[in-house]
């Protein structure tokens, strides 16, 4: 028997999908018959559920422990971990929540979950030097237009057109009360890690569009045009200043020499 076959069989026995009709391989029968196996299986599932609860604190705060753990239980059996670091577990949970029946009356929950995931990805991302305003100011206008700036590896951003996802998320993360006068409108968010801790700030639609364009390899001129297409009233200099202060852009190698 190949090691990979054993690992796949054991994994399917530990976290069988709900309603699975395919029985485990016959060679696993002896293992499954052991009284301790059920305990181990429950421990594995609990560890995954605990990880989701820890990795999605804003969602947890919004829906409560029982609701979240029920949703996590369903997710775990459909999407078992593929990484030994449980802190990284939960990619796809936002999309799962958007199709989860009990969340039908919480249409903003998926967007909030995406911001929780952005925090995790920013926290785990590789270190890299951030672009400095002084270097950018030294570039000639014609050279600046042709620059292909890249988002920092730890930068994450999201635009939610329908819900105030950032304010909802921020209130849960920071323990802030919800403002009854908060307008129910689309919002964007930027998460970065310029030093050791993840930081966050609101980001307008134009800022999200600019970062989307930079991530796709657009020149700075084209990225600026896409930002203005998203919001013709955007203040581009102020927007770029925000991205620089937040460490959202990666320093080109030429700026490090």
What are the language-model segments listed below?
Residues 1-140, 196, 201-257:
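Long, charge-rich, low-complexity alpha-helical segments
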Residues 110, 117-176:
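Short, functional C-terminal segments
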Residues 153-216:
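Low-complexity, glycine/alanine/valine/leucine- and proline-rich hydrophobic stretches
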């Amino acid at each position: 028997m190949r090691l990979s076959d054993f690992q796949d069989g054991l994994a399917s026995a530990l976290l069988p999908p709900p309603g699975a009709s395919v029985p485990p391989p016959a060679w696993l029968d002896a293992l499954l018959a052991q009284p301790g196996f059920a305990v181990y299986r429950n421990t594995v599932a609990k560890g995954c559920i605990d990880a989701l609860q820890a990795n999605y604190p804003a969602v947890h705060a919004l829906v409560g422990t029982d609701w979240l753990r029920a949703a996590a239980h369903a997710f775990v059996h459909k999407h078992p971990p593929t990484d030994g670091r449980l802190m990284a577990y939960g990619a796809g949970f936002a999309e799962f929540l958007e199709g989860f029946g009990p969340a039908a009356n919480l249409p903003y929950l998926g967007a909030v979950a995406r911001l929780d995931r952005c925090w995790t990805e920013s926290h785990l991302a590789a270190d890299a030097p951030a672009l400095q305003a002084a270097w950018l100011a030294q570039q000639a206008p014609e050279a600046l237009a042709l620059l292909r700036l890249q988002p920092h590896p730890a930068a994450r951003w999201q635009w939610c057109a329908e819900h105030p996802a950032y304010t909802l998320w921020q209130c849960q993360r920071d323990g802030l009360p919800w403002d009854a006068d908060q307008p129910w409108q689309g919002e964007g968010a930027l998460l970065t890690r310029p030093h050791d801790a993840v930081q966050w700030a609101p980001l307008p639609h134009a800022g999200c569009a600019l970062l989307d364009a930079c991530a796709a390899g657009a020149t700075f001129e084209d990225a600026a045009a896409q930002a203005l297409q998203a919001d013709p009233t955007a203040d581009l200099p102020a927007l770029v200043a925000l991205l620089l202060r937040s460490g959202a852009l990666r320093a080109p190698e030429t700026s490090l020499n």
